[in-house]
Amino acid sequence: MLKYVDLKEKPSSFLAATGITDEEFQALLPNFETAYRQLYATNLTFQAQPRRRSFGGGREAKLASFADRLLFILNYQKTNPLQTMHGLSFGLSQGQVNYWIHRLLPVLRQALAAMGMTPERDGAQVATASSASEGGANLSVDGTERRIHRPVNAEQQKAKYSGKKKAHTDKNILLVNENTKKVVYLSATTEGKKHDKKLAEESLIRYPKNATLTKDTGFQGYEPEGVLTAQPKKRRKMKS
């Protein structure tokens, strides 16, 4: 069963499980605990009923510590597993996993926002976002896809099927500051079938003055006004 106290002793495994280092985890943890206490009163049970015994009393819960709760939600976000499989990693039933996911995601979002680490979701705001110009407005754009369960509806199956991934997916585009490696912008989630270029155009991103933009072939033809774009050429494989 995954526990923070055990996993932190294995740096490479910790990074693979959460996407961050233990040092970054420790910086996030106090904000995560503060956000949790702000969102959920500790004098109430998880069902919002008055608590009869003191908080932390009784049998120890599987996710008793804030460190384990943060590990749980970061690992879920990083790996996107089936809830049943995620439960096996933390000793929880599928129902308990579903409960904790919905309880902890708002906490994580609030904690990251308090640290100024949440990306813009409105493309029009990118031009004035300090994160976009930090160190110079050298940006890169990329599409990211996540596998999803095959939809039951036939039309949804067609819309969600990504020819690139040969699977049913959801898609977003990310705008990253190449100087700081921070995600500046995260688009709305859309079906995996949609092309990267089309999603970028629909996002109506406004760029800072004198911005440069690195893109791949998925964004060929995407030329925002006033932005110097570059598309690195792929090396051709040498025939043996």
Summary of predicted features, one role per range:
Residues 65-79:
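Short, amphipathic alpha-helical "recognition" segments used to contact nucleic acids or chromatin
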Residues 1-61:
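Charged, often Cys/His-bearing segments associated with DNA-binding zinc-finger transcription factors
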Residues 59-67, 162:
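Structural motif
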Residues 17, 61, 74-75, 90-93:
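Short secondary-structure transition/capping motifs
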Residues 30, 34-41, 78-82, 106, ...:
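Short helix-loop boundary/capping segments at the starts of domains
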Residues 80-240:
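Short, well-ordered secondary-structure "scaffold" segments embedded in the functional core
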